[in-house]
Amino acid sequence: MEKFEGYSEKHKSRQQYFVYPLLFQEYIYAFAHDYGLNGSEPVEIVSCNNKKFSSLLVKRLIIRMYQQNFLDNSVNNPNQDRLLDYKNYFYSEFYSQILSEGFAIVVEIPFSLRELSCPKEKEIPKFQNLRSIHSIFPFLEDKFLHLDYLSHIEIPYPIHLEILVQLLQYRIQDVPSLHLLRFFLNYYSNWNSFITSMKSIFYFQKENKRLFKFLYNSYVSEYEFFLLFLRKQSSCLPLASSGTFLERIHFSRKMEHFGIMYPGFSRKTLWFFMDPLMHYVRYQGKAILASKGSFFLKKKWKCYLINFWQYYFFFWTQPRRIHINQLANSCFDFMGYLSSVPKSPLLVRNQMLENSFLIDTRMKKFDTIVPATLLIGYLSKAQFCTGSGHPISKPIWTDLSDWDILDRFGRICRNLFHYHSGSSKKRTLYRLKYILRLSCARTLARKHKSTVRTFMQRLGSAFLEEFFTEEEQVFSLMFTKTTLFSFCGSHTERIWYLDIIRINDLVNPLN
């Protein structure tokens, strides 16, 4: 425990405590920095409805807040109807979002300074094609074949939001900033007192995305920092590398340039550390911890993490949030794929001089397949098919032009194929294409009050080309003598693209 506290103090002593230049007057918070740190223009906050607000507007809103004594009203009367005197009631949901987004920009300044202050020799060249989500899968394919066990971790989130404020106290010495943060959290917890705490957190996350991301990343960064400490204490092997997973390809070359960094404040998705026996990858609200060794070792790590969350973050997490599985006998959900490392039998013919014999061996293979049930569920929710996968028309789109209908269906189909091109089994993808193509035909037939067969005959090959994916275009150029769809389903090669930087592209087009 003494080592743990000493390690913690050493980490905190490195923090550059940044007294925020907020208090220009007794009660006015204003921005003193351009967020880009390169100019003097006021910071602009982009809201969800694409309106921009400058720091001057935020300053005026805070003055009005104090003039109307809203601090007392919000605590004493949290359930008053905000729609009754809307013009005089300042702290509406709209203004609350402006202030919280502005506050999030200000508290991110020290962490932006920390990134800018990194030595030039440690900088990593950033290339757009190296940020692809797909580039993590070749890394897993290369490393996971030699590991035994995998822990699938759902990173718990503290129910009490005061814990997040306490974590920031180590990094932020500006007391009024912390009071303002508590005010935001208090306001939403009071206003949502009639619902559960988890729903309150969800509402706060939805309405204050930037501030919530900052709080969540602060918590995750603290958790991963001490996870690194546990890793160092549990093994006599030196840590090979750790760092922000900025680029996710050419791993062996990049390992030489990585220094120890503490991520999370620029909305980065992935972070990792690795050594010959252990690999850690975090994505969204989950993490994967894979390693060699015995099952008992994995249970010790599970116990470490549960006790760590309980005694350091002061909240109890359920043991079922950490699943320990043997890689050879299980699959795991990762970035929209069901991945596994099965042992496949391989028959090898060996010949020595005049004698030949067969060797039956087993080889591990990193397998990625498409979760068919999940994707059909998305299509069903978007009313492209029934729950069992039977295509139906989309009545809400019948008012659009024929070209717009074809373009929307074709774009959804191409997005699904593009993201799941790394699947080792293409049959599910062609089933999804069939559902979307027939749903499109039924939508057009419904619009023109015709039958599906008649409309298909009228459009001909132009209708099929709209659903012709980029992957199939590549194969059609390679196999020019084949017919248009003769190669469909005949190849099982996985294709990983280097231009996919968001997993949300899978679901967003359906909504």
UniProtKB/Swiss-Prot annotation:
GO terms for molecular function: RNA binding. Usually encoded in the trnK tRNA gene intron. Probably assists in splicing its own and other chloroplast group II introns. Keywords: Chloroplast, mRNA processing, Plastid, RNA-binding, tRNA processing. HAMAP family: MatK (MF_01390). The lineage of its organism: Eukaryota, Viridiplantae, Streptophyta, Embryophyta, Tracheophyta. Belongs to the intron maturase 2 family. MatK subfamily. InterPro entries: Domain_X (IPR024937), Maturase_MatK (IPR002866), Maturase_MatK_N (IPR024942). Pfam families: Intron_maturas2, MatK_N. The keyword Acyltransferase does not apply. The keyword Nuclease does not apply. It is found in: Plastid, Chloroplast. The gene is matK. This is Maturase K. One of its GO terms (cellular component) is chloroplast. GO terms for biological process: mRNA processing; RNA splicing; tRNA processing.
